[in-house]
Structures are given as structure tokens and as C-alpha cells.
């Protein structure tokens, strides 16, 4: 398992001194093997709606050390959404996933699909938007430059075409991420032996199957204190809200 992150990389306007002190105190408790204490402090920071890949990464490590594998998988997935290029998160997530009972292994994707998935997940949604804006700005700048340039105007026009096409592709990727986040919500089962039912009522519903801790599911809708979920196997069922954490 990869090590803890001791420095929270943030701007001075993002996290207050109090949050930084809590983060450092949580790291200290982790180093003293007080994982419950570390979890409590990290969760306090999360409850104050501060978002950081490093925060969720350290929280995931604390959950893992405490044997709370479902919670650690949830935290690592949250961290990966915020810091998609941080390799330690991917490594620790793989270790945590290996602890899942009856883990479902999907067949390998077609190489072009796999390439697109990796490309799309390399940046966050807002990073893709920033790149789009940057390319549009460069295209406009070179276009204005081409109006006063006499020599090599063909080269400049080709460069404008490449930048414009790249901006268009990046916009499509950003839009795809937006649609995916809007239409599909995922969650992690955080308890073991969670019973899934045919409807959102225990007494009137049939028990369909049992889910293991750490299983990743798609959340379709909620009704009262229940979530309707969808599994990779194609099955649908209802489980109590407290049994799952939404990513």
C-alpha cells in the first residue's frame, strides 16, 4: 500500500488554517496507528464540504488500515475523480478491490474503447474545459496573427485548423463526461452481506440476492430510505440507503 500524503496541496484561499491543522492532526494520528482517530478528523473535514484528492486518499488509507474495505474503495474512487493522474490512488484502489469477495471481473474492452476511456479519465471535467478554452484562445490568436502575417501563412492556417479541431474534440470529451456524470451515479456497498430486495419495502418485498462489501453499483433512483441499484450482471434491486455510499 502506498504511503500517506502529508502535505495538502491547496491554494491559500481554498482551505482555512483550521482545516489544515485538522488535516495535519489526522496525519499524526495515522502515524501513531490511531486509525479511528484519523478517520474521525478526515471525516470532519469532508463534512465541511472541502474537496481534495489527497484528503480522500488519506481517508481511504485510514479505512483500509482499519479493515473497512468498502469505505476505503469509496474514498479511493472519490479521490480518483478529483486527482485522476495520481498513480498511488489507482495502486491502492487495486489492493482494496482485491479484498472484495466474489469480485466481478469484466472482459477486456476493445483497444480503441479502452484508449478513449483512459484518455477521458486522464483529466477532470473542469480540466478538459480549461484545455478547450485555451485551444480556442490560441486559435483566435493565431487567426488574428495570420491577418498581418505575410510569409508562411499556409503554415499558420494549418496550425489554426489543428487547434480548432483539437478544441472541438476536447469539447466533445468534456460533454461526454458531463452526460455521464448527469445520467449515471455510482455507489459502493460499505457493509458485508447486504440483502437486496425486489422493492423498497422489506416486509412486502422478496429478497433477491446478497451483496458483498466493496461492490460497485449504479444508483438509479431513491425512494424514501431506499436506493434502486443496477449491477454489472444486469440485475436490479433495492437496498437501504445506509448500506451504500454514493461516489
Give the role of each language-model region:
Residues 105-147:
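Membrane-embedded alpha-helical segments of integral membrane proteins
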Residues 155-178:
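Internal/C-terminal transmembrane anchor helices
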Residues 209-242:
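SH3/SH3-like beta-barrel superfamily modules
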